[in-house]
Amino acid sequence: MLLRIALILGCWSILSEGAENDIAEREDRKRPIWNMAHMVNAISQIHEFGALGANSIETDVSFDKNAKPEYTFHGIPCDCFRNCMNWEYFNHFLEGLRNATTPGNPKYRDRMILVVFDLKSNGLYYDAQARDAGKNLALSLLQNYWNNGDNGGRAYIVLSVPLLKHYELFQGFRETLKEQGHEELLEKVGYDFSGNDDISDIEEAYRLAGISEHIWQSDGITNCIYRGFDRVIQAVNAREKFEGIIKKVYFWTADKPSTVKLALGESVDGIMTNYPNVVVDVLKIDEYQQRFRFATIDDNPWEKYKPYGK
């Protein structure tokens, strides 16, 4: 009798393990999605949008006359039905962000895994300040977010620049982290040009910057205006090239369920939205639940998605 029970339990254990493996395999086949809360410029909003299901945020960064990051602020005009005026001093915001993304901190949110800094380099006094802006940004992040490399925030960072001619901002950022002895932190940093330029021009700007990895590509417009998906399709096609440098594509700003569905239908990796809960609801629908899942910290945002086994 005891032998029979042992055999039954053993078989049940094997079957259970097999079922768990099947579930894990099905999850691996799903495209991870970064649910990106738009215009998160106050510390309180990190937690507000996280509670709505965001696993990523986008934050606006303005610079002072000396090309130092000064505020997290968008201002008027901004998206329809949003308060455009939330703000923090940049370094103070970084401290709040570090608290929200550092395991063990009482304010830690384990789902918050990526931050897009929308760098308002078009507000610099001179184009020649772009490199200095990158240097100053690196120093601010190093001290106030990464805590000088000592148990800082763990979120991945995407530096998003609106103008191709400001590619030197990326160079200044990278040079500074290397000079400060923290080149390893570049593994946490990605890049994006957000001006909806031609993909070929964007690739040339990255060539000039000396960057060929960790590249996201955005496409979109304010939620006040409809935008089609022609350029999204171009970006996705560029991503799918065997030797293409683009690894992830995200669309902004998608607030309606219909827009979210269209974006997912084009196989984007990220959706920037004013309503992360809308994206959550769409991914609960069987058609989308079978193909997509929300990204976690274990998903590498610098790697092209490949279905399990391919």
Curated annotation (Swiss-Prot):
EC numbers for this chain: 4.6.1.-
Cellular component, GO annotation: extracellular region
Residues of the active site: 38, 74 (nucleophile)
Cofactor entry: Mg(2+)
Propeptide feature: residues: 19-26
Domain of life according to the entry: Eukaryota
Cofactor note: Binds 1 Mg(2+) ion per subunit.
Binding site for Mg(2+): 58, 60, 118
Tissue: Expressed by the venom gland.
Keyword terms: Cytolysis, Dermonecrotic toxin, Disulfide bond, Glycoprotein, Hemolysis, Lipid degradation, Lipid metabolism, Lyase, Magnesium, Metal-binding, Secreted, Signal, Toxin, Zymogen
Catalytic activity: an N-(acyl)-sphingosylphosphocholine = an N-(acyl)-sphingosyl-1,3-cyclic phosphate + choline; an N-(acyl)-sphingosylphosphoethanolamine = an N-(acyl)-sphingosyl-1,3-cyclic phosphate + ethanolamine; a 1-acyl-sn-glycero-3-phosphocholine = a 1-acyl-sn-glycero-2,3-cyclic phosphate + choline; a 1-acyl-sn-glycero-3-phosphoethanolamine = a 1-acyl-sn-glycero-2,3-cyclic phosphate + ethanolamine
InterPro entries xref list: PLC-like_Pdiesterase_TIM-brl
Annotated signal sequence range: 1-18
GO molecular function: lyase activity; metal ion binding; phosphoric diester hydrolase activity; toxin activity
Glycosylation sites: 99
Keyword Lyase: yes
Function summary: Dermonecrotic toxins cleave the phosphodiester linkage between the phosphate and headgroup of certain phospholipids (sphingolipid and lysolipid substrates), forming an alcohol (often choline) and a cyclic phosphate. This toxin acts on sphingomyelin (SM). It may also act on ceramide phosphoethanolamine (CPE), lysophosphatidylcholine (LPC) and lysophosphatidylethanolamine (LPE), but not on lysophosphatidylserine (LPS), and lysophosphatidylglycerol (LPG). It acts by transphosphatidylation, releasing exclusively cyclic phosphate products as second products.
Protein name: Dermonecrotic toxin LiSicTox-alphaII2
Originating organism: Loxosceles intermedia
Lineage per the UniProt record: Eukaryota, Metazoa, Ecdysozoa, Arthropoda, Chelicerata
